[in-house]
Curated annotation (Swiss-Prot):
STPGR repeats: 66-92, 181-206, 217-242
Additional record remark: 'Shippo' is a Japanese word for tail.
Function summary: Outer dense fibers are filamentous structures located on the outside of the axoneme in the midpiece and principal piece of the mammalian sperm tail. May help to maintain the passive elastic structures and elastic recoil of the sperm tail.
Record flagged with keyword Kinase: no
Species annotation: Xenopus laevis (African clawed frog)
Taxonomic lineage from the root: Eukaryota, Metazoa, Chordata, Craniata, Vertebrata
Stated name of the protein: Ciliary microtubule associated protein 1A
Swiss-Prot/TrEMBL keywords: Cell projection, Cilium, Cytoplasm, Cytoskeleton, Flagellum, Repeat
Family affiliation: Belongs to the CIMAP family.
Entry's localization field: Cytoplasm; Cytoplasm, Cytoskeleton, Flagellum axoneme
Domain of life: Eukaryota
Record GO cellular component, one term: cytoskeleton
Length: 256
């Protein structure tokens, strides 16, 4: 093939890096866990032991035990302090003051007055107490006792009582004899109450038997001439477009 077919300086060459349009699947979008290191290692792969170099441990400077911090005097033995007793000079303590009992002159019998002698009662005028107006004790008028007059008392015997009403027209001198009730005025009891009751029937609307109310297709609703599935049929072809292999799927959310 000569170089006359190519126009310009562009020539077919291998791409330097992967082109996303070459892949129909997300492909490199998913980051698989690595097989090296300790962090984010693939759990389905064997992981070799990993070692790290750290700094040197510091030696504890502060000792928790008292150690030689105690200053034991030289005259202290297992039985106590050894040596002669030592004394120190200190001031004299103060004497405790004695209780001063009151004498006869401390009392004033003349001031006893009402406490030691009989005296007449004395009264003083003061203002009215505040609790007097808020006394909630009910008085005699607060109780609603039932009346003892009339026949409404169940535990008391009541005398006969009478009431006055108007004069009845029945049997009086001005009774209208033309208003005698006729046969239609009386309410006749149904004989079926106290005699043998015959059967009773009522007429109602015709009941429709339950069934399927959907519309069933008739013979004219079918088109047997349009059925081609039961007959031999030639293959059918359709014209479509050719999809490019460089069309990449739409990736909206891409993790950084």
């Amino acid at each position: 093939m000569g170089t006359d077919l190519w126009v310009g300086t562009w020539r077919p060459h291998r791409p330097r890096g992967p082109i996303a349009a070459f892949y129909s699947s997300p492909g490199p979008k998913y980051s698989l866990p690595g097989n090296t290191g300790f962090v984010s290692h693939d759990p389905s792969r064997h992981r070799a032991p990993a070692y790290s170099m750290g700094n040197r441990r510091f030696k504890l400077v502060d000792d928790c035990s008292p150690g030689p911090g105690y200053l034991v005097p030289s005259n202290i033995t297992v039985k106590g302090k050894d040596g002669t007793p030592a004394y120190s000079i200190y001031g004299r303590p103060r004497d405790i003051s004695s209780f001063r009992t009151p004498g006869p002159g401390s009392y004033s019998p003349e001031r006893a007055g009402k406490s030691a002698y009989r005296s007449a009662p004395t009264y003083s005028l003061g203002e009215r107490t505040k609790t007097f107006g808020n006394d909630q004790t009910p008085g005699p008028a607060a109780y609603m006792l039932p009346s003892v007059i009339g026949p409404r008392i169940v535990n008391r015997s009541s005398a006969p009582n009478y009431s006055m009403t108007g004069r009845s027209k029945i049997g009086s001198f001005h009774e209208d004899l033309q208003k005698t009730p006729g046969p239609g005025t009386y309410r006749v009891i149904d004989p079926g109450t106290y005699k043998h009751k015959p059967p009773q029937y009522s007429m109602t609307a015709r009941n429709v038997l339950p069934g399927d109310t959907t519309i069933k297709p008739g013979p004219g609703a079918y088109s047997p001439e349009k059925v081609v599935m039961s007959k031999a049929q030639a293959p059918n072809f359709s014209f479509g477009i050719r999809h490019s292999e460089y069309v990449a799927p739409l990736i909206v959310d891409v993790a950084d």
